[in-house]
Amino acid sequence: MENRWQVMVVWQVDRMKIRKWNSLVKHHMYVSKKAKGWYYRHHYETHHPKISSEVHIPVGQARLVTVTYWGLTTGEQSWHLGHGVSIEWRLRKYKTQVDPEMADKLIHLHYFDCFTASAIRQAVLGRPVLPRCEYPAGHKQVGTLQYLALTAWVGAKKRKPPLPSVTKLTEDRWNEHQKMQGHRGNPIMNGH
């Protein structure tokens, strides 16, 4: 019998981001109680030797499963050290891979307070308006002038600790171009 291979998308991350993700998930499960119904599965509760943890997040009838791995083949950079994350959307027997932005949007829609464009209608009708959105990155599109005015009027408030974000977990800050503040460099070399 031949080997059967299963291919999955695994996002390479460093282990400190995985530790931060796990601690944020546990905080919102046990302290803030915003992550109701979430299930955290430890590495010793699974039979797969490369799985370090799993987080099962109910989203309607389906659920998002974020699996963190260790002991994978070493990544492109030395700090990756073979750690990774896969994100899966499951509904009964159907499973599919999900990118981090989509996972964050699904979590945001089901679990955390949101100040959305419907707030304009609520304010016009004289109903109470939710004062903030706990995941503003979920609203990347440019809002209407009324929406922008209402958000400026309500004001933003920093959340401590931040909400668990799959996008933040998988972002690659190491390979981004580093900008030095206040450093012009050699004027001959930079074209001035």
Swiss-Prot record:
Annotated segments matching region RNA-binding: 75-114
Annotated region (Interaction with host APOBEC3F and APOBEC3G), positions in chain: 54-72
GO terms under cellular component: host cell cytoplasm; host cell plasma membrane; membrane; virion component
Motif annotated as HCCH motif, chain positions: 108-139
Segments for region (Interaction with host APOBEC3F): 14-17, 74-79
Record's subcellular location: Host cytoplasm; Host cell membrane; Virion
Keywords: AIDS, Host cell membrane, Host cytoplasm, Host membrane, Host-virus interaction, Membrane, Metal-binding, Phosphoprotein, RNA-binding, Ubl conjugation, Ubl conjugation pathway, Virion, Zinc
Multimerization, as annotated region: 151-164
Matches recorded under HAMAP family: HIV_VIF
Family per similarity comment: Belongs to the primate lentivirus group Vif protein family.
Record remark on domains: The BC-like-box motif mediates the interaction with elongin BC complex.
Protein name, UniProt field: Virion infectivity factor
Organism encoding this protein: Human immunodeficiency virus type 1 group N (isolate YBF30) (HIV-1)
Highest classification ranks of the organism: Viruses, Riboviria, Pararnavirae, Artverviricota, Revtraviricetes
Gene that this sequence comes from: vif
